[in-house]
Amino acid sequence: EKDIRTTVVKITTENGARTMGRPQGSYITIEAPGLSVHDEDYHREISLEIARHLQNVINLERELSILVVGLGNSAITADSLGPHVVENLHITRHMIREYGLQSLGKEKMHRISGIIPGVMAQTGMETAEIVKGIVRETEPDAVIVVDALAARSAGRLGVTVQLADTGIRPGSGVGNHRSGLTEETLGIPVFAIGIPMVVGAAAIVYDTVGAMTEVLRERVECESSDEEKGTKKEKTKKEAIKTEETEEDKETRKNGGKWTKEEPRRRDEKRMIPEMLRVEEAFELVKELLKPDLGPMYVTPHDIDERVDFLSYTISEAIHGALFYNK
């Protein structure tokens, strides 16, 4: 009803992991076109959907200590989603430690702590090094990592929420390969939440070429269909106009197909477009072609400030909903 679509992919075997190119685990994608609009009711519904999935992947049967890590550079708007989420959180760990649950009027509550580790250019340290030290000293039961992502398609920019129970590799979307925040590196479960906030120039060009190719394909098929209809109308004619036949044309005629002088040209047009689409490496090719002039260029929406602001509240409210209001 609200045009929200959720896709859950579970990779449970090593063969599946190799095929998908991802570690074993659960991957959840929530597609919500309305996220680009500041509609409080719509965003509240998305928060509830995210909270429901967080409750499914995190074992919340007992009281837990949860560390929320806001990845990204708070000085760059498109990369500041994680820091904004942590700033919006209701942090409870210190209050429960000092004053007990009674100070919050609760009999049971998860202890939430948060950290904004910044980026290596600001701290001189890997994010993984900072988080490892915090995990070692504060001993949380699990980590929730929030980060802005790079979209592979312009259509997913700011309108999809991705969750995973396999952790995250900071900066990998924009070519900065850093140490991962995973259960293997931290020793505790790591859950990742991300929203694509930038899209590469290569992705925009790739989408455009793909759309143009699809239009050309439809046009060729439409013209071909019109010609077939015209041929049927002229069925009363005793003989079609023929030109020199190729071996392929002879085979077509032998199998009961019709052949006219227009068909070789039309057949070549049909064959050309699938050939273009068959190349799976097209995206990498586009990146290489753009590299000399544009390099690793990334684009953001014109209203990125506003989007980061209300999307950060959507995520922080989802975390609150999962940890404070779970049954």
Language-model segments: which ranges?
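Extended, charged alpha/beta regions that create polyanion-binding interfaces
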Residues: E1-E63
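Short glycine-rich or small-residue beta-strand-to-loop segments that form or flank ligand, phosphate
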Residues: T29-P33, S65-I76, G114-G118
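Conserved acidic residues
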Residues: I66, D141-A142
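Gly/Ser/Thr-rich loops at beta-strand to alpha-helix junctions
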Residues: L71-L81, A121, A148-R152
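Glycine-rich phosphate/diphosphate-binding loop of Rossmann-like nucleotide-binding domains
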Residues: N73-H110, G114
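A structural-propensity feature for long, helix-poor, extended segments
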Residues: L104-I134
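A structural signal for small-residue-enriched, beta-sheet-centric alpha/beta enzyme cores
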Residues: I115-I116, V145-N326
